[in-house]
């Protein structure tokens, strides 16, 4: 079988295994003891978006990473956008796992990802300029099985606006992967630059793109990637497997959300990867038996960026309230997010696909100040009421939401919400320290979904989260 763009006339190796692990904390030393005794441990937590993305995964992963040894991404690329707020600092990541804020936490860009090396370099430089240390090859490792986004991928992606993609080259790179002509980090030493240039120019011409590439440009680009990231490229599946055998706690950080999943989302208005639980361990290079917790992240309302129908979308003053108070603009593109009431039909679908063991509810504070709050509990298609999402995006356009209505609660400033969260946690109040109407809203969601809500977000700050007690 012909392998396009790869020559076996060259050799090279970029394996770099982290041989010195940090001292194990008391939090996971018990897992290490169990492992040494030959007892089964499952020290992996999966964090997934349960809606159309932008649910607040970065903030949750940042909190969880405090007691984790590794945070690994397993799919997507720089089409993701994760935000972490540390005091006055607002950190926005597109490729780096959100655990980067924890200096003792190892970071992995896993097998299932597509990675733009130039974007990664800029993100690392921004991190260093902000006072951080460059983790490349020290605590940041790149899977040698991950595929590389090259400039021609972004040229092609910029031509198609019908789906409403981020234009970052994600789709074309995954297309090359499926067509078995993509370039992985493991293949960097074996590139045939003339053949690569010929193939890429043919693809550019076919797409109607004016740009062209040369073998010399490609050779320079590949050489730069090797020099910049060579020490970080390794078999991260082996690295994570060894860590799990030691009893280390690993967080598998999802990007986008279940409704953007290529198989389970609102096709064709989806991303190009599998964003759901089934791909978490596969895309990280470990087996699924390691997972003991699956956390679904959902806003207290719902948002969507790009094209495709959203049944509960609001075009009135309530929609404006959610947009302005929630600061609903995309981390990656800056695009205004469409806002709507919480959609339990979407969440039921997401839970069926992912099997959430718990739910983290974010941005409850944004609902403050509304006289009433609605929850979509079903859809009406003509005269028929349904409780599940239709597979067809066209059929979804015919769905009208069926609501239950609940009383609202008072608004507070972000500082006041932060104070409420800190009091709830420091005094062991849990959700009982929240406004009564907010408590009722949480209980109603749990009753509808049949899944426990383990935490509630009351603002962007790291401490503005109330944990269930």
Residue ranges and their predicted role:
Residues 28, 32-33, 38:
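Short, positively charged and aromatic/hydrophobic N-terminal segments
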Residues 11-13, 31:
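Cysteine-centered motifs
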Residues 2-7, 32:
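Ser/Thr/Pro/Gly-rich low-complexity, intrinsically disordered segments
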